[in-house]
Amino acid sequence: MVYPIYSINDALVGFQSPTIMNNDAFALRAFSENFSDVKNPADYSLWKIGDFDSDTGEIIPCVPSVISRATDFVKGEE
């Protein structure tokens, strides 16, 4: 099975360690839960950086693409 590989980009530090998720929906949920309260949300974005084939062990690169930005999930004042 082929699973997408994601990485969080911190604009001040760079890309973080990659993680494998089932699909974009799972990745977006995890990203939104972890980055909705963060300071400086404009610094963080979720990127798809490739795929992992669990049958062959191959990592398949792709042109990195932004899936979402933390600013999309910032909670308003309550």
Q: What residues fall within each predicted segment?
A:
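Short aromatic-glycine-(Arg/Gly/Cys) micro-motifs in beta-strand/loop hairpins
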Residues: M1-F15
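A generic alpha-helix propensity feature with a strong bias for hydrophobic helices
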Residues: S7, M21, P64-I67
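A short, exposed loop/beta-hairpin motif centered on an aromatic-Gly-Thr core
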Residues: G14-N23
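Charged, amphipathic alpha-helical segments
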Residues: N23-E33
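Short, mixed-charge low-complexity intrinsically disordered segments
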Residues: N34-E78
